[in-house]
Amino acid sequence: MTKGQGFGFGLGKIKELQEAFAKAQQVQAGAQQLQQELEQMEIEGFSEGKLVKVIMSGNQEPRSVTILPEALEKGADELSQLVTDAMKDAYTQSTETMRTKMEELTSGLNLPGL
């Protein structure tokens, strides 16, 4: 080892490490706040014709299903499809909302892979 090289962990590396820890703490605090925000959200999904409405949280937790009387007249198979379509719509919107919120949280932090 040549004089002055040390173990490659000079002041510059320590500063980088401190910055990385600070970013991690920012992300952790933001993630906790985002988790609470997502839990409080109510995202609606609908079937075609809005005969069935599903409400989910921002964490994809189902909250309620509302079925209009006209949907009941469609029969079991079609009603099942309407409920499935409304669930998929709510899920898609919920995951898109979560993805957007995560991008907002991590933007500007220059985190690799995010």
Swiss-Prot record:
The keyword DNA-binding applies. Keywords: Cytoplasm, DNA-binding. The keyword Cytoplasm applies. Its main location: cytoplasm. One of its GO terms (molecular function) is DNA binding. It is found in: Cytoplasm, Nucleoid. InterPro entries: YbaB-like_sf, YbaB/EbfC. SUPFAM superfamilies: YbaB-like (SSF82607). One of its GO terms (cellular component) is bacterial nucleoid. Homodimer. Belongs to the YbaB/EbfC family. NCBIfam families: DNA_YbaB_EbfC (TIGR00103). Binds to DNA and alters its conformation. May be involved in regulation of gene expression, nucleoid organization and DNA protection. This is Nucleoid-associated protein PCC8801_2554. It comes from Rippkaea orientalis (strain PCC 8801 / RF-1).
